[in-house]
């Protein structure tokens, strides 16, 4: 009887110890801080930069990196404005140079202490809140099997006797769509309304974001899709398809610089700063050219596939303040033009 009691007591003690150890292990797992990043949908896709970024950062941060893919860049800012100081996000990654003035005026973002003096960009972007992480040029992509003589200017695309069709993104939700709005405004100025009416005649559909529009294009739903001059590299590298190309326009191409920023309401400010610093490191930057298909912001060699990618020789820009001042007016002009077709 005594032996049995001792065995029972030993079993009880071991059980208590095991439960305690499991509880400690659970607490340790739960104690890992979580850094939440809002970004656009394509960034977190299986072929996007997100999965590799998550793996690389978690190896050095002793944290969980939670990357949440939403809609395109403009929609990201709209979401943050709606959430205000109650946003669960610590960082937003996916705004761009065309939104930084508008984003700054929301008061939702805090200064960063990241040294950007060594960054290599096509234009100067001095800002201590919004940190650049890549850049690219807006362009219309086409399939060389369908289009044997690509347009060499906006005028050729719009005024061609060929029944060419276009898919692009909504400027109210997408940084690409906003980029096209600014591109046309920069090239045509007061004639922009007429240009939009001509584009409307060729438009198959207008999507909320890049992923949907590019997917439709690859299915053959249009002759041209608004994307980036570097986009054809994806099919070339992953599928060996060299039939996609960017149409280079004599008027020049609008430049986009993508940026990230830390929210004032972040519950992990130190970890957020660590991620922002990591963002301009070689480890992060080398992932982008063949996942996000954009150019890095540090001095580094590009993958060999970029040797076959066309690069615009002329880039176009508006000052950020001009965009903030006229953005709503230009969007209304676009809405009016396309709604009357």
Please identify what each model-predicted range represents.
Residues 34, 38-50, 71-75, 87-222:
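Extracytoplasmic ligand-binding site segments that recognize negatively charged/polar headgroups
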Residues 51-67:
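Short alpha-helix C-terminal cap/hinge motif
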Residues 98-102, 218, 222-243, 292:
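A ligand-binding cleft/hinge motif common to bilobed small-molecule-binding domains
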Residues 110-116, 128-132, 155-158, 236-254, ...:
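Short beta-strand->loop
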Residues 139-146, 185, 256-268, 287:
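A bilobed periplasmic-binding-protein/Venus flytrap-type ligand-binding module shared by bacterial periplasmic
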Residues 263-318:
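Mature extracytoplasmic/periplasmic domains
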Residues 305-341:
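Extracellular/periplasmic bilobal clamshell ligand-binding domains
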């Amino acid at each position: 009887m005594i032996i049995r009691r001792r065995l029972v007591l030993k079993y009880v003690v071991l059980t208590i110890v095991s439960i305690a150890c499991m509880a400690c292990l659970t607490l340790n797992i739960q104690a890992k801080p979580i850094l939440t990043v809002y970004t656009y949908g394509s960034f977190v896709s299986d072929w996007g930069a997100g999965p590799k970024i998550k793996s690389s950062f978690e190896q050095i941060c002793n944290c969980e990196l939670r990357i949440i893919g939403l809609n395109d860049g403009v929609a990201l800012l709209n979401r943050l404005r709606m959430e205000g100081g109650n946003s669960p996000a610590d960082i937003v990654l996916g705004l761009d140079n065309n939104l930084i003035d508008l984003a700054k005026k929301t008061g939702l973002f805090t200064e960063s202490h990241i040294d950007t003096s060594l960054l290599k960009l096509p234009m100067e972007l001095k800002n201590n809140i919004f940190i650049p992480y890549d850049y690219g040029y807006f362009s219309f992509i086409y399939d060389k099997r369908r289009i044997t003589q690509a347009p060499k200017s906006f005028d050729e695309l719009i005024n061609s006797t060929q029944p060419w069709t276009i898919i692009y993104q909504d400027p109210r939700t997408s940084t690409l769509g906003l980029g096209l709005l600014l591109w046309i405004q920069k090239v045509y100025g007061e004639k922009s309304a007429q240009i939009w009416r001509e584009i409307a005649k060729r438009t198959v559909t207008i999507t909320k974001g890049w992923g949907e529009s590019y997917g439709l294009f690859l299915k053959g739903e249009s002759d041209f899709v608004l994307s980036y001059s570097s986009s054809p590299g994806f099919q070339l590298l992953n599928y060996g398809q060299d039939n996609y190309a960017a149409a280079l326009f004599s008027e020049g191409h609008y430049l986009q610089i993508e940026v990230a920023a830390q929210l004032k309401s972040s519950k992990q400010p130190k970890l957020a700063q660590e991620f922002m610093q990591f963002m301009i490191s070689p480890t992060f930057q080398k992932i982008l050219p063949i996942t996000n298909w954009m150019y890095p912001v540090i001095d580094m060699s590009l993958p060999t596939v970029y040797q076959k990618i066309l690069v615009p020789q002329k880039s176009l820009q508006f000052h950020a303040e001009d965009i903030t001042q006229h953005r709503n007016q230009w969007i209304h002009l676009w809405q009016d033009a396309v709604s009357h077709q």
